[in-house]
Design a protein with these regions (language model features):
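Alpha-helical transmembrane segments of multi-pass membrane proteins
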Residues: 2-222
Length: 222
């Protein structure tokens, strides 16, 4: 049976699984920013800011460059949610593993898309990232995001603040989980930025490897 449980929680929530997802998440954001015309695949707040700025100045073409990844992100969340509702109780393959396989295939294709089609590549990555963030929302029982930092930063800081007040070990553990994921996201982004700068568009395949490890991990018990 796939998608096994550990201590009443699904293996998809294990910290080690979240670590692979966070590394991949940081890598992908650095990849699209550095190799695909400085557009974020996941930091949609930044895309909203830049889109609005260009629209307000009448630069519609530049604004659309940031609008399309936003639309792709919305569609990715919608598709992942539909897959969950339809295949939540599938026994042959856990629905989360199905999402990972789809993401791996999409990112593998992106590695072949030339610079002349950078917008297409960014749209594909945004769609895949949205499916991931919608699919993996818990880590060790805590709500988190594997593809962005702001929510994790808030939650980690709040947990540490509560620990200073209450001195509960669980609160310190929670803070460590969140800051650990942020650190791993940053490592992924650093690697993504440097590797793509030196070796180009094919480096997105490293994210495929990381997601593949997450996929395989979900066959195991903790």
């Amino acid at each position: 049976m796939v998608g096994k449980n550990f201590s009443g929680k699904q293996m998809s929530e294990a910290f080690i699984n979240s670590a692979f997802l966070a590394l991949s998440g940081g890598f992908q954001d650095a990849y699209t920013y550095n190799t695909r015309n400085e557009v974020f695949s996941n930091a949609q707040t930044g895309n909203v800011v830049l889109m609005s700025q260009h629209f307000m100045t009448g630069d519609w073409k530049a604004g659309v460059r940031y609008l399309l990844p936003l639309i792709a992100f919305v569609l990715g969340v919608f598709v992942a949610d539909q897959i969950q509702m339809r295949y939540k109780y599938a026994r042959r393959l856990h629905w989360r593993q199905g999402i990972l396989l789809a993401e791996i295939v999409i990112l593998f294709v992106v590695g072949f898309i030339p610079h002349s089609l950078n917008m297409t590549a960014t749209i594909f990555v945004s769609f895949a990232r949205a499916m991931q963030v919608q699919t993996f929302r818990k880590m060790g029982g805590y709500s988190y995001a594997s593809t962005m930092c702001i929510g994790n930063l808030r939650s980690g800081t709040a947990a540490f603040s509560h620990y200073l007040q209450d001195k509960k070990t669980e609160q310190l553990k929670q803070a460590a989980y969140y800051f650990g994921i942020i650190f791993l996201f940053a490592i992924g982004a650093g690697l993504g930025g440097n590797l793509t700068e030196h070796f180009g568009i094919h480096m997105i395949w490293i994210s495929c490897i990381l997601l593949g490890l997450s996929f395989l991990l979900m066959f195991e018990n903790e």
